[in-house]
Curated annotation (Swiss-Prot):
Substrate binds at residues 46-47, 68, 166. Keywords: Amino-acid biosynthesis, Arginine biosynthesis, ATP-binding, Cytoplasm, Kinase, Nucleotide-binding, Transferase. This is Acetylglutamate kinase. Its EC number is 2.7.2.8. Its main location: cytoplasm. It catalyses: N-acetyl-L-glutamate + ATP = N-acetyl-L-glutamyl 5-phosphate + ADP. NCBIfam families: argB. GO terms for biological process: arginine biosynthetic process via ornithine; L-arginine biosynthetic process. InterPro entries: AceGlu_kinase-like_sf, AcgluKinase_fam, ArgB, Asp/Glu/Uridylate_kinase, Glu/AcGlu_kinase. Catalyzes the ATP-dependent phosphorylation of N-acetyl-L-glutamate. It comes from Dehalococcoides mccartyi (strain ATCC BAA-2266 / KCTC 15142 / 195).
Length: 272
């Protein structure tokens, strides 16, 4: 990607909790992207921190299909840890680097509205709507939004249930990228690339190829929601990529040089 061609364009970046360590350079890269004229929008996870605090409080972590069962006490921890601790640590780090940043959650401004998925997973939900008003207001003031995926439980909310809902940050990132009509969606992960059916690392692939990886069962575990989100973003006009956030300055390299992980290209963006 030639940065000069996308100056002032929106790049949605999903930060996995596993890449937010003391040695990680992702936030420094975001500061550099701001200097290059891009408009980063950050969505973060923090599952390991939630699990740590759950253990400290004597709460059992239960997973269904790799996702956290979110009962009442767990929702308290998720909301406090993601929207409070993790979100504000990221914002403080960016401020310390000279980046004007503001931490919000999906609840604020009804940025992300969701509904419960199933009774057995409690307050774990899916995105039903994205309101970009608050995000755009921050971007217009040159403030970088840092978004926790704790969201507004409103759609088909059962009587007497809580107004907060826990939404996986991966699908949230794809929905936000699509709603903003972002130029790029970038997933910072702890794997080098998406793997093909023979275990090979994949570079640039079409959206159709990504869909085939999902339908065939080749993609598994945490790669499934990431690829689904990439497809959502490509349908809205973005390109999407999955890169290894553990490698120093990988984000800047991807957005200036490209070819750093796996890039998913929609049909309208495919090279002739």
């Amino acid at each position: 990607m030639n940065v000069s061609q996308v100056s002032n364009h929106i790049v949605v970046i999903k930060l996995g909790g596993s890449v937010l360590s003391s040695k990680d350079t992702s936030l420094k890269d975001i500061a550099a992207l701001k200097q290059l004229g891009l408009k980063p929008v950050l969505i973060h996870g923090g599952a390991s921190t939630v699990s740590d605090w759950s253990a400290k409080l004597g709460l059992e972590t239960r997973l269904v299909n790799g996702e956290r069962v979110t009962d009442d006490p767990t929702l308290d921890v998720v909301a406090a840890v993601l929207t409070g601790l993790v979100n504000k640590e990221i914002v403080a780090a960016l401020l310390d680097m000279g980046v004007q940043a503001a931490g919000i959650s999906g609840v604020d401004g009804a940025t992300i509205t969701g509904q419960m998925r199933a009774t057995e997973t409690g307050y774990l939900g899916d995105v039903t709507a994205v309101n970009t008003g608050l995000i755009n207001a921050l971007l217009d003031k040159d403030i970088t939004p840092v978004i926790s995926p704790v969201s507004f439980h409103h759609t088909k909310r059962p009587s007497g249930s809580r107004r907060l809902i826990n939404i996986n940050g991966d699908p949230a990132a794809g929905e936000i990228a699509a709603a903003l009509q972002a130029e790029r969606l970038v997933f910072m992960t702890d794997v080098p690339a998406v793997k093909g059916k023979n275990g090979e690392a994949l570079g640039e692939i079409s959206a159709e190829h990504a869909a085939e990886l999902l339908s065939s069962g080749t993609a598994s575990g945490g790669m499934i929601p990431k690829l689904r989100s990439c497809l959502k973003a490509t349908l809205a006009g973005a390109s999407a990529c999955i890169i290894d956030g553990r490698i120093p300055h990988m984000l800047v390299r991807e957005l200036t040089e490209g070819n750093c992980g796996t890039t998913i290209i929609g049909q309208h963006l495919r090279r002739s």
